[in-house]
């Protein structure tokens, strides 16, 4: 998944 900045966030 990508956030609004085009960065994939996996926490």
Curated annotation (Swiss-Prot):
Expression tissues: Placenta.
GO cellular component, one term: extracellular region
Albumin domain span: 1-11
Keywords linked to the UniProt accession: Copper, Glycoprotein, Metal-binding, Nickel, Secreted
Location(s), subcellular: Secreted
Record PTM text: Glycosylated.
One term of GO molecular function: metal ion binding
Family, as annotated: Belongs to the ALB/AFP/VDB family.
Subunit structure: Dimeric and trimeric forms have been found in addition to the monomeric form.
Function: Binds copper, nickel, and fatty acids as well as, and bilirubin less well than, serum albumin.
Name assigned to this protein: Probable alpha-fetoprotein
Source organism of the structure: Bos indicus (Zebu)
Lineage: Eukaryota, Metazoa, Chordata, Craniata, Vertebrata
């Amino acid at each position: 998944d990508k956030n609004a900045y085009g960065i994939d966030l996996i926490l």
